[in-house]
Structure formats: structure tokens, C-alpha cells
Regions:
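Structured alpha/beta reader/binder surfaces that contact nucleic acids or chromatin modification marks
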Residues: 4-102
């Protein structure tokens, strides 16, 4: 399962249901991480409609709080109130459904 670490502010907003997207820079590092799960389409800029579970972890320790979210991914811009820089392109993980919490 793909695991992404996020800051507490964003983790809490996602957990409360307020934040519905998570952003990652469009860089080779994330291309390599996303392709095995979402396929080549995400690199080519197409929205991947297939839903995949992603573990969002608040910290690097395996015991850190985490949630499993069902997500789709696309390339696009994000919302500044959710941490995105205006006009910058990101891999946008759209959170479709919240799963279990650890």
C-alpha cells in the first residue's frame, strides 16, 4: 500500500473531513511512487478514475497516527487553503472515502 507522510495540520483537516485533497510535487520521485499503483496515466496527465487505498501518516514512525483513504489521482492545481501554491501543478490525490484509523 502506498504510504504518504503529512503534517499534523493537514492530517487533522483530512480526518475531520474538511480537506478532500492531498498534494505532491510533480517530480520523478512521486512518478516512481505513483506509477505502480495508478499506472502510467498519472504521469501522462490523465485522471485515474480507479480508486486505490493510500495510507496517510502523520509522522515517519510506524506507530504514528495514520488513516487509510480511498483516493483517485490526477495532475492539476490545488487549493491554497489546503496548502497548494497558486498556479503550481501537483499530483492531486482526491480523497473519495475515509477508511480505518490507526
Amino acid at each position: 500500500m502506498l504510504t504518504l507522510t503529512i503534517k499534523k495540520k493537514w492530517f487533522d483537516m483530512i480526518l475531520s473531513g474538511e480537506k478532500k485533497e492531498e498534494y505532491r510535487d510533480c517530480k520523478p520521485y512521486y512518478q516512481k511512487r505513483f506509477c505502480p499503483y495508478f499506472g502510467r496515466e498519472v504521469v501522462d496527465g490523465k485522471k485515474v478514475r480507479q480508486v486505490f487505498p493510500v495510507r496517510l501518516r502523520n509522522g515517519y514512525d510506524v506507530r504514528s497516527p495514520s488513516i487509510i483513504a480511498k483516493c483517485t489521482v490526477r495532475r492539476g492545481t490545488g487549493k491554497p487553503e489546503w496548502g497548494a501554491e497558486p498556479g503550481k501543478e501537483y499530483y492531486v490525490l482526491d480523497i473519495i472515502e475515509m477508511g480505518s484509523e490507526k
